[in-house]
């Protein structure tokens, strides 16, 4: 009898520790494709994208698990496990998420996994706890879909550093007004044949005039940040090397009301004189960082790329209205099994 009593006590104690703080012990199960659950999940993804510090926006792919806990004295807490996919829109891109393309398998897709605790009270959602990480698809799986497609390459690869410097140099040479400085290397891929390196990066306007800058380290970013997102490719041909780069300006980061507009770009196919060997350093923000100090990673992991709510104990959270749900809301009634929910795009 004593053993049964002790077992019951331990069971209750474990339940108290595993439940989100401020909730009752009981929770109700809801279908992952329930319209209200999807509304909460879209709110969570919206929060994620609003707090991204670098990398690319993510979009909801699947709701894996959901529990709804009653919260004392009012409201309820949604405990969600979500799968997301990386889009082609950078974190600074003002394009609405609904208009962002999902990065496909052949483009070396990246999947995110997130846990959220979201309080619903008086018709508002407050994010109480977040925890995310992300991983690229394996090279083997990409090769199954597209044997000759470009694969993600570490940021500190000498070929990548070389390509970024060449592209930035070409951009500043073409732009005869403001000197731009690299602030983030967002993505890099290589193709063995024909030998080429493809990079995506963010630059910002400085107080220096282009194209001739003796010491880039002395150039400071403007008070009202003017960012541009660039895509560039460096091709190794029999006749030499060729770099192409195109950049798009984002609205000014202040009271910015200016719409996104094309920034000066190097026309495709213009050869650019390159140094004899890859440079030893790469300009990042206001500093010159040696290439060997760049991180040995192939993408910006959500674990480090966004600023989350620290823990479930910050119960005040950040209150905001949920985004408008677009498209089919899924099944209105409970499904069997309740979870996981439908896959909106594809699984990695």
From Swiss-Prot:
- Keywords linked to the UniProt accession: Disulfide bond, Glycoprotein, Phosphoprotein, Repeat, Secreted, Signal
The reply on keyword Secreted is yes
Question: What SMART domains does its record include?
Answer: CY
Task: Give the SUPFAM superfamilies listed for this entry.
Answer: Cystatin/monellin
Main localisation: secreted
Instruction: Report the SS bond pairs.
Output: 32-339, 89-100, 114-132, 146-149, 208-219, 230-247
Modification after translation (UniProt): Phosphorylated by FAM20C in the extracellular medium.
Phosphoserine carried by residues: 134, 138, 307, 311, 314, 316
The name this protein goes by in its record = Alpha-2-HS-glycoprotein
């Amino acid at each position: 009898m004593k053993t049964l009593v002790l077992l019951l006590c331990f069971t209750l104690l474990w339940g108290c520790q595993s439940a989100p703080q401020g909730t009752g012990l009981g929770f109700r199960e809801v279908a992952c494709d329930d319209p209200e659950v999807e509304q909460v999940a879209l709110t969570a993804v919206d929060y994620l994208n609003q707090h991204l510090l670098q990398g690319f926006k993510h979009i909801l792919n699947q709701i894996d698990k959901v529990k709804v806990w009653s919260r004392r004295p009012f409201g309820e807490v949604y405990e969600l496990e979500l799968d997301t996919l990386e889009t082609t829109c950078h974190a600074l891109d003002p394009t609405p998420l609904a208009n962002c393309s999902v990065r496909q398998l052949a483009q070396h897709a990246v999947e995110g996994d997130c846990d959220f605790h979201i309080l619903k009270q008086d018709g508002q959602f407050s994010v109480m706890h977040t925890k995310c990480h992300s991983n690229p698809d394996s090279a083997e799986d990409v090769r199954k879909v597209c044997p000759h497609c470009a694969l993600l390459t570490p940021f500190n690869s000498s070929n990548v550093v070389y390509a970024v410097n060449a592209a930035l140099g070409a951009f500043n040479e073409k732009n005869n007004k403001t000197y731009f400085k690299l602030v983030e290397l967002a993505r890099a891929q290589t193709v063995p044949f024909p030998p080429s390196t493809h990079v995506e990066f963010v630059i910002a306007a400085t107080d220096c005039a282009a194209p001739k800058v003796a010491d880039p380290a002395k150039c400071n970013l403007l008070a009202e940040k003017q960012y541009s997102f660039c895509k560039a490719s460096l091709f190794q041909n029999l006749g030499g090397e060729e770099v192409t780069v195109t950049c798009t300006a984002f609205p000014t980061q202040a009271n910015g009301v200016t719409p996104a507009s094309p920034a000066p770009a190097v026309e495709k196919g213009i050869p650019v004189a390159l140094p004899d060997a890859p440079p030893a350093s790469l300009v990042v923000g206001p500093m010159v960082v040696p290439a060997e100090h760049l991180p040995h990673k192939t993408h910006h992991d959500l674990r480090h790329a966004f600023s989350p709510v620290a823990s479930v104990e910050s119960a005040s959270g950040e209150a905001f209205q949920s985004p408008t749900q677009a498209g089919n809301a899924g099944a209105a009634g409970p499904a069997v099994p309740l979870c996981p929910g439908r896959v909106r795009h594809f699984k990695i």
